[in-house]
Every structure is written in structure tokens, then in C-alpha cells.
Amino acid sequence: MAANYSSTSTRREHVKVKTGSQPGFLERLSETWGGMFVGLMAFLLSFYLIFTNEGRALKTATSLAEGLSLVVSPDSIHSVAPENEGRLVHIIGALRTSKLLSDPNYGVHLPAVKLRRHVEMYQWVETEESREYTEDEQVKKETRYSYNTEWRSEIINSKNFDREIGHKNPSAMAVESFTATAPFVQIGRFFLSSGLIDKVDNFKSLSLSKLEDPHVDIIRRGDFFYHSENPKYPEVGDLRVSFSYAGLSGDDPDLGPAHVVTVIARQRGDQLVPFSTKSGDTLLLLHHGDFSAEEVFHRELRSNSMKTWGLRAAGWMAMFMGLNLMTRILYTLVDWFPVFRDLVNIGLKAFAFCVATSLTLLTVAAGWLFYRPLWALLIAGLALVPIIVARTRVPAKKLE
């Protein structure tokens, strides 16, 4: 298979050096204007991210509180209770599918909700390391290109390499990755909707120790099938295939007991479908394991809180970086004076930190204003603290 491509060898590398003149003041000023535009976009985007995140977080929290107050647990999962029609139900049980999932090309068959085939190709990979330095009043950029062979699941286009000769990769894989999904999945008498099936994602590696080599040109080593003449010494273009599964259906002597999940959804006949809340959100929850309704909602609230704080931090960082780029022009104007330049740089970063913090808190308060006005006013008050502290320090310095 690999005869038409570059043969595998030891790590290779080469170095390129580009020389250019030091950028003048106008050139650096022009680059700063481009950075200011990028900074402005990041600054504006941060407001949208922070504001919409607060609305999403409060909407989710309200929906979860509503769901917790309405959820009911049926007496049995093996019968459909008519009195629960349209209600939010809490179901615990083992997953069950109607048929085996299989990949006949490799002799893999098992009862599960999902079966994933993962294909990797042995390919050349280019890594690039650059450094800039000044020599004889010229700016030089040294770039070191290194080439090594690795197993990769995506095609690496060797035409984009700095030096393709001797490092050519195939343009396609003879075998592709895929995921097979059971069309019907049940818990007792209840059928899971497609949204719940998508949430079954606890993939586990499938051991191939009890499987035979499916074809004479495929060799099994460990938990991989190799399309290779010698798996110990692979060539560029060789393939290796592994399998994983999610949601084991029924007890299996080799794979273990059936996978148990906890589902909270709306009962519609014998189906479990999304539940619409008064706030306009939907509840369709699946957790791996056996949990009470209270535990599920507590886990969801904790997840919502972590996501909210993560997006707040991302919004603050976007605002901070945007302000840094927007004020960079002031640094460029004084970068001829080393001492003054360093002081200005520290001052600009402190300014960006204070403004980003204040504006983030104000934006959070604006997002909360639609749901909890009192909390919004409190946060707005806290947002003014850095500004008040900064203003009180100025008169103190004047008195000195």
C-alpha cells in the first residue's frame, strides 16, 4: 500500500532564514491600526457573549426549578401509565435495543446503542518552530521545519508542507471512520427520542482479543486491526482500525451488565420526548447511572453554573484583549523610549484590566435586570468600585 508514497525513516528537518529590514514608524503604526480594528471587534463581541450568557443561564435555572417542581416518577417502567400522559417523568432503567450493531468487514457484532469505527493512517506530520532576532540592523526570521511519522485520524495534505518531496502522504483513506446508531432504543416499555439517543455518548474501547483476523491482508494486534504488511514497522499509508461502543444493551459475559441511565423527559404515549417549560426552554435530560430526580436536577444546576462562569471568563478575556489591542497605538507612539515605554505598557494593561472588569460586571447586571432587578442593582454597585477607587487615588497623589 505504501509503495507509491514516501517511505518511513528517521525524523527529518531543515531550516530557512528570511531577512528583512526593521519596520519603520509608519509601518508599525499601520500594523497597529489593523490590531485596533480586531480589538474593536473582540470588544463588541464580548458584550454580546456576556449579555446572552446571563439570559441563557437564568432561563436554564428557571426551567430546572420548574422541572423539579413538576417531575413525577412512575411506579414501573414496564407499563405506560395513562395518568402521566404529557407530564414530566423520571425514568431509571437499562438500555435495550432491537438488534445487534455490526461491522461485517471486521467481524464485529455487539448489542449497543452506538458502535464507532475509528480509522487512523500512518502519515508524515510537519511541525514548524520560528524565532525572530536582530543582526546587523536587520530583522531575521529563522524557521525550523521538522517531519515525523504519526498515526492520525484526519488526512494531512502534504502539498501544504514546506518541502513535500520525501514527505508525501496519500490523499484519501481506503477505509473511513463511521458511527452506527440503533434506530430504536428502549427503557422498559418506553422508547427514547432521537435527542435522548444522541446523549448516549459514554464510549468505551472494544477489546478485540477474542476476534480473529477478518481477511488475509488484515492483521490484528492488541485492540487494532492493521492494514499493513508489518504492524511493528508501519509505512506511510498504512491503516489501523479500532472500535468503541456506547450504551451496552443487555448483559454480556465479556462486556458486562447492561448500561443503566436516568432520563427526565415528557411522556407522550410510550415515547420520551422534550418537555417545554413556561420560560420557553426544553427539558430532555439523560444521565449515565442511577440517580434520583433531585440528584439529576442538582447535577444540571451545577453544570449550568460551571458553564455560566466559563463563558463569563471568556467574555472578560475577550474584552480585556480587545482593550489591549485598541490602546496599543499609545504604546507604539512611545516605543522609542525604553523606560517610558515600559511604564506606559504597565499603565495600559492596568487600565484594560479595570475597565474590562467594570464593564463585565455592568453587562452581567444588565442581563440580570430582566429577571432579578435587585440583584442587578447590587452588581452594578460593585462594578463602580474599581472606578471609585481609581478616582480617589488621583487626589491623594496630587496632595503628595
From Swiss-Prot:
Pfam families: TMEM43 (PF07787). GO terms for biological process: innate immune response; lipid metabolic process; nuclear membrane organization. One of its GO terms (cellular component) is nuclear inner membrane. GO terms for molecular function: identical protein binding. Residues 53-313, 367-368 are perinuclear space. The modification N-acetylalanine is found at A2. Its main location: endoplasmic reticulum. It is a multi-pass membrane protein. Keywords: Acetylation, Cell membrane, Endoplasmic reticulum, Immunity, Innate immunity, Membrane, Nucleus, Transmembrane, Transmembrane helix. The chain crosses the membrane at residues 32-52, 314-334, 346-366, 369-389. It is found in: Endoplasmic reticulum membrane; Nucleus inner membrane; Cell membrane. InterPro entries: TMEM43_fam. Residues 2-31, 335-345, 390-400 are nuclear. Belongs to the TMEM43 family. May have an important role in maintaining nuclear envelope structure by organizing protein complexes at the inner nuclear membrane. Required for retaining emerin at the inner nuclear membrane. Plays a role in the modulation of innate immune signaling through the cGAS-STING pathway by interacting with RNF26. In addition, functions as a critical signaling component in mediating NF-kappa-B activation by acting downstream of EGFR and upstream of CARD10. Contributes to passive conductance current in cochlear glia-like supporting cells, mediated by gap junctions and necessary for hearing. Can form oligomers through the transmembrane domains. Interacts with EMD; the interaction retains EMD at the inner nuclear membrane. Interacts with LMNA and LMNB2. Interacts with SUN2. Interacts with RNF26; this interaction is important to modulate innate immune signaling through the cGAS-STING pathway. Interacts with CARD10. Interacts with gap junctions proteins GJB2/Cx26 and GJB4/Cx30. This is Transmembrane protein 43. It comes from Pongo abelii (Sumatran orangutan). The gene is TMEM43.
